[in-house]
């Protein structure tokens, strides 16, 4: 492991220290390493051809006209990406779905965009992780 020195302005250092404390890091180095790993993983998952895993979460109104069937059709169209799906009834009108996906990150992003763009889908979020060799 190498020791390096970086220069941060006072506000950024204060933000780093606050983040480190909130997340329970023992020191700034651990926080910086995790921030860097996260940035590298995000960059890697934005490239076509990169294999990886993802979690797509979204809320939708299950009685919105044909929405549930359109979402299912989209899932079946991309069946090769789907590992598992969890369906949760939030209340009388809304459902939360969490889909675990695996495959080419470009295809995963396309699938997520198709689902999130459906009218009636809210709070769509895709979290990607590159496959580690």
Curated annotation (Swiss-Prot):
Pfam families for this protein: NikR_C, RHH_1
Single GO biological process annotation from the record: response to nickel cation
Keywords: DNA-binding, Metal-binding, Nickel, Repressor, Transcription, Transcription regulation
Organism domain of life: Bacteria
InterPro entries, per the entry: Acetolactate_synth/TF_NikR_C, ACT-like_dom_sf, Arc_rbn_hlx_hlx, CopG, CopG/NikR_regulator, Ni_resp_reg_NikR, Nickel_NikR_proteobac, Ribbon_hlx_hlx
SUPFAM superfamilies hit by this protein: ACT-like, Ribbon-helix-helix
Cofactors (names): Ni(2+)
Function field: Transcriptional repressor of the nikABCDE operon. Is active in the presence of excessive concentrations of intracellular nickel.
Record text on subunit structure and interactions: Homotetramer.
Family of the protein in this entry: Belongs to the transcriptional regulatory CopG/NikR family.
Protein name: Nickel-responsive regulator
């Amino acid at each position: 492991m190498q020791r390096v020195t970086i220069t941060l302005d006072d506000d950024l250092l204060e933000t780093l220290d606050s983040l480190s404390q909130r997340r329970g890091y023992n020191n700034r180095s651990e926080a910086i390493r995790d921030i860097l790993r996260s940035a590298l993983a995000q960059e890697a998952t934005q490239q076509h051809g990169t294999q990886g895993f993802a979690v797509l979460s979204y809320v939708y109104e299950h009685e919105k006209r044909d929405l549930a069937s359109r979402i299912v059709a989209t899932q079946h169209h991309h069946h090769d990406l789907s590992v598992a799906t969890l369906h949760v009834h939030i209340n009388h009108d809304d459902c939360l779905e969490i889909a675990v996906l695996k495959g080419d990150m470009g295809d995963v992003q396309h699938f997520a965009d198709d689902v999130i763009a459906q009218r009636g889908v809210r709070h769509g979020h895709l979290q990607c992780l590159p496959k580690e060799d």
